[in-house]
Amino acid sequence: MTNPKLPPILINKAGSVYYVYTYKNIWDRELKRSKRGESKKIGTILGGQKEGKIRFDEAFLQEHPEFRNYQVERKGKDYVFTPISEEGITLEQARNIKKLHAGATWALDQIVADSPVGEFLKECFPRHKDYKKILSLAYFLILNQNNNVSFYESFAETTRLPYPRALSPSAVTRLFQRIELRDVQRYFSLMRSYLQEDEDNKIILALDSTSISSYSTNLTHIEYGKNKDDDALPQLNVLFLVDQKSGLPIFYRFYDGNVPDVSTIRHTIADQALLNMKNVVLVADKGYNSVKNINDCLINKVEFIFNVRLGTKGCLARELIDEHRKEFADLNSGDPYIRKNIATAKVNWKYDPRPVDGKPASNTASAELYYHMFYDPVIYQEAANKLTESLLTIKKKLLEEEALTEQEEELKEKFFRNDKEKGLVIVNRRVDEYLKYKGFRVLVTDSEKDPVKAWTAYADRWRVEDAFATLKDRLGCNRIRCSDNKALQGKTFVQFIATGLSLMVRSRIRSYMRENKKAGKLNLVYESDSKILQVLNNVMQTRFNHGYYFDEVAGKKIKYFEALDVRVPGAGPETPEEVPEEPETEPLLGTDIEI
């Protein structure tokens, strides 16, 4: 078969891409010789080099259909023709072409590049390119929504990832075992330095914990305790600190499953000291407020905003509410922004600056605390309506001799009494007592005098709750799926990184929707973050020996990249990074990895 004849060709570079042009010579009457006339683009050299395979433009192939049957490659000044099979590819191409899911991981790469996460991982985990492996596993958790790493190898075979080689289950286990506590603490330290670059502003950290269940009996921290998912399984507890400004989780620690939340503040403060964090305000929910925790914060000069429990009769918060009831009845106490009635009480708090176990507290030190009280009449009315509806339903069932549910029996015992003349009647005094503190919230703080700012800081702690929802629901990490203590540290850290990246994705989508609403634009993105990433994951990338090429991106996928504030991947090639294959060795002796 005779090769077709190429027209005159020029090679011109634009940016990082070499383009192929053809031209025609024309006669110059003045110079009395031929010269090069107008040129026309006919193709692109693949691979980003001056030599390589040529991808001809469709317009050229329509004019010269004979070139459809050949792969043309530029080598030096020569052009090599390779016949193409009926399937449209050469045999060499058939061996080396590979399609990868790439759009979602491309977007995640851009988000990582805009944050300190990738840089800090590289600094802390440079060996064996572990930082790339950690990111790749984090992407797997985000896109696969399952933390069973036995699925990772097949996922990596078909997905564009920072670490381009697939990792076997044993290689993943070795990675987890290499992630040591000192390296994790180094990462936390770098994150702390990043947050404290703006020395003028306080760092507000939302603090909370959750329980993660396990079937394993080998892990040190696994104990039966108060399971927050109502699983009848032993658990370990994981505590997160989340920066409320950026939404980034910056610290975690796990502890025994039978340790209540209220007991963890002291250890967290100790960890804070290790991190050498300054100018920090801890924001925590009711489970963390106690006299001991307030004292520990004051002793260690850690500022705090705690939500106070109101369920205990005779507690200080209830007394303060009762003292200020007239203020709550005054409509002028309502704030137009948070839509709550507000009152604040200053309390002179006594504490022992140097407590010793077993000795009575000296209470020689004192601090001024602010008890900010908030009343929402709507919440009160909702509680009153719900209770009234339940009590009237019970009354109706009793009159019609219908059976009561277990919950209704409890309400009957609590709010009804037998009257000799009227029979079973509702005791209004008990109802009033039950509703007396409904609609109230009390925040105690040593530093924030402004009640609205305190409320806002507390309201923003949804970020840590969002972190746990992301970890357990969206990433499928409600089970540990690890039975080795040495690997647990590494797996938890990878899940921590995945949680942070997922929260950054959600934050960008929220910001996009908020800006559209502010500008009065039509919001074209309604799907959840996971749905958006799944759609983008179907943006494919074709891999050749000489590079990677994204398929054309069109339609709503362009809008999704815009919602994530990342650029659409271009047509130019990505050059694959060569990484050595990790040798297959067994996990460290004495380990038992459940995957």
Tell me what each language-model feature is.
Residues P234-L236, F254, E303-A457, I532-I595:
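An anionic, glycine-rich sequence signature occurring as long contiguous blocks
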